[in-house]
């Protein structure tokens, strides 16, 4: 049984957490994030510590307790440090470019794939086989990174495709001759 919901969140210097109704707002050096939390969970800010209490003991409320605490903790971490995902393109002729607000992927299809970046996310392409996605919202960064990876997810025989940095691809052996 997890007890993440009972852990307190220590606020670093320069971070403010406020609540209006069910909307939690976190302000920090890198920006501001807002998120709606469930009315079944109450949040209290005492000095530089944030605590969460739940209204009951049924399974839904217990699940929301830990999830809400984790979401607010990710908001605090995002406005202080930010989040970053790095993707690698593996395959002959696979490359990426970033022009304007479009990420252009050449990954073996007949035409290049163009993806528009979300407003909350920053994209860098240091070399044509590496894509760095960063931002203060963990959800937005992870969702966009997953969208990019889904364009050509790694295949198990040669490992070609778009993968996360440090992702291990389970390789299959090909067919053997008679």
From Swiss-Prot:
Function as written in the Swiss-Prot or TrEMBL entry: This protein binds to the 23S rRNA, and is important in its secondary structure. It is located near the subunit interface in the base of the L7/L12 stalk, and near the tRNA binding site of the peptidyltransferase center.
Record keywords, A-Z: Ribonucleoprotein, Ribosomal protein, RNA-binding, rRNA-binding
GO biological process: cytoplasmic translation
GO cellular component terms listed in the entry, alphabetical order: cytosolic large ribosomal subunit
Homology family: Belongs to the universal ribosomal protein uL6 family.
Protein name: Large ribosomal subunit protein uL6
PROSITE patterns given in the database record: RIBOSOMAL_L6_1 (PS00525)
Disulfide bonds: none
Pfam family, one: Ribosomal_L6
Assembly and interaction partners: Part of the 50S ribosomal subunit.
PANTHER family, alphabetized: 60S/50S RIBOSOMAL PROTEIN L6/L9, LARGE RIBOSOMAL SUBUNIT PROTEIN UL6M
NCBIfam families: L6_bact
């Amino acid at each position: 049984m997890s007890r993440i919901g009972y852990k307190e969140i220590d606020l670093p210097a320069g971070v403010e957490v406020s609540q209006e109704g069910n909307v939690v707002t976190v302000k920090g050096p890198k920006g501001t994030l807002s998120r709606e939390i469930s009315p079944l969970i109450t949040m209290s800010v005492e000095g530089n510590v944030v605590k969460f209490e739940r209204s009951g003991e049924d399974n839904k409320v217990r699940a929301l307790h830990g999830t809400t605490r984790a979401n607010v903790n990710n908001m605090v971490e995002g406005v202080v440090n930010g989040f970053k995902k790095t993707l690698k393109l593996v395959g002959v002729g696979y490359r990426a470019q970033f022009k304007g607000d479009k990420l252009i992927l050449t990954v073996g299809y007949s035409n290049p794939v163009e993806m528009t970046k979300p407003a909350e996310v920053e994209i860098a392409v240091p070399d044509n086989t590496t894509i760095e996605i960063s931002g203060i919202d963990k959800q937005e960064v992870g969702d966009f990174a997953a969208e990019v990876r889904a364009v050509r997810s790694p295949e198990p025989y040669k490992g070609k495709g778009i993968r996360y940095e440090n992702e291990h691809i389970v390789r299959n052996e090909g067919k053997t001759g008679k």
